[in-house]
């Protein structure tokens, strides 16, 4: 899976063939098909490998935010989505950066394959969407949803593009860079949802 993750991050999912994954991993020609069925099965496992922990952490942060009982502010909602990504980069700089790049590219391309984990009725992502909508009670929910999609897509891309700085050895510098990204996205979301 490491070879697939590296290729998907570098070339994009559509730019990678099953054959190139087998070759990069030093495997027999039918290995990916045997273990994963096809490229989509492999991609699903690549996403799930790190995605399960990310979604679980988002659920923890969301539960804490919901337990507070106050109407959420945009920055708190953005942090629920973003903080687990920052933690992933701190824990696994190379693999985390690759994973975030893959997810960011799939989300930006509106590729349904990324939505197989953490999405659907009652999912963490659906609850985050509801939290964002609650932050803007005077705005139509469909307008908030559209603007949150733009903001969250931008957030993923900014984190992916800043992975080297966010995984730097100096925690304080990395945290400061992360806080700028979160603040930028939160203020942008606030601006377009209050308009």
Question: Which ranges hold each PLM region?
Answer:
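Short, amphipathic alpha-helical "lid/cap" segments that border enzyme active or binding sites
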Residues: 1, 55, 75-82, 148, ...
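Generic hydrophobic, amphipathic alpha-helix propensity
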Residues: 1-5, 21-22, 46-61
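Solvent-exposed, amphipathic alpha-helical segments
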Residues: 3-10, 57-64, 102, 106, ...
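Helix-turn-helix
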Residues: 7-49
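Hydrophobic alpha-helical connector segments
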Residues: 59-97
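Amphipathic alpha-helical packing segments from all-alpha helical-bundle domains
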Residues: 76-79, 95-101, 110-136, 145-146
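Short alpha-helical scaffolding segments that buttress acidic/His motifs in well-ordered protein cores
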Residues: 81, 85, 100-107, 151-155, ...
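C-terminal peripheral helix-coil segments that are non-catalytic and often amphipathic
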Residues: 122-195
